[in-house]
């Protein structure tokens, strides 16, 4: 929910190897006084969660996600460490790394590689459609129950009522224009997002790139929000037309 108020700083982060960075995360962060009261987006929580899962399953994050999510869903084109870089579109022309293609843009995930719980997934619209359908089917896909129905219901409830804005578990919220019921929403740093409306059985998968060839963050965010507002407005209008007699 990004309300742990994680406090910490890792100097020379990008110069460390994977084990050094993992040790630094495990010993450099602690919860602050505003825990549960303020939403501050940080990927430190998902990185630490990844380390916890590795301890529980005694596998790397890539192995955990591949065996329990990607392969059972049939997301055969999705991976964290692509072997054929030409299958991946360029991400950014970076000052230090040159043209980033087929390796994660995120500097922490770039160092952590198979141990990263915060970033680095390469996918396409066909595979992401399978992932989204699992959510729309309340956790089920092709007779395999990935998430309990109760878990999907739980995701649609504000998990931090004492905080300054609502959040779900791992997801942000957007809201239906007419009813103000919550929709699951998540963005990726490079310009992607997912918007899932479980009740209306619809979703918006947006695959774009805001950092290549140039990064115009503010312009992108403004235009993205306009696109979302238009989509939600038109979606609500279509729904009203379909339900009116």
Locations of regions flagged by a protein language model:
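Active-site-proximal beta-strand/loop segments in catalytic clefts of secreted hydrolases
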Residues: 1, 187-188, 207-209
């Amino acid at each position: 929910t990004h309300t742990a108020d994680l406090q910490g700083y890792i100097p020379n982060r990008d110069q460390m190897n994977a084990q050094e960075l993992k040790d630094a995360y495990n010993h450099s962060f602690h919860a602050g006084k505003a825990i549960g009261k303020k939403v501050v987006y940080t990927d430190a929580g998902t990185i630490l969660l990844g380390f916890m899962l590795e301890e529980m399953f005694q596998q790397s994050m890539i192995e955990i996600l591949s065996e329990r999510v990607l392969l059972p869903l049939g997301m055969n084109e999705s991976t964290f460490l692509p072997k054929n870089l030409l299958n991946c579109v360029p991400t950014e022309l970076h000052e230090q790394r040159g043209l980033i293609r087929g390796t994660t843009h995120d500097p922490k995930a770039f160092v952590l590689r198979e141990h990263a719980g915060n970033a680095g997934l390469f996918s396409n619209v066909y595979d992401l459609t399978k992932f989204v359908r699992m959510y729309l089917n309340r956790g089920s896909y092709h007779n395999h129950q990935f998430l309990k129905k109760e878990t999907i219901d739980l995701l649609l409830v504000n998990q931090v009522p004492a905080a300054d804005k609502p959040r779900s578990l791992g997801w942000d919220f957007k809201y239906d224009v007419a009813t103000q019921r919550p929709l699951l929403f998540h963005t990726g740093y490079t310009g992607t997002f997912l918007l899932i409306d479980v009740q209306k059985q619809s979703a918006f998968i947006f695959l774009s790139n805001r950092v290549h060839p140039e990064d115009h963050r503010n312009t992108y965010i403004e235009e993205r929000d306009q696109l979302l507002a238009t989509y939600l407005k038109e979606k609500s209008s279509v729904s009203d037309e379909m339900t009116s007699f």
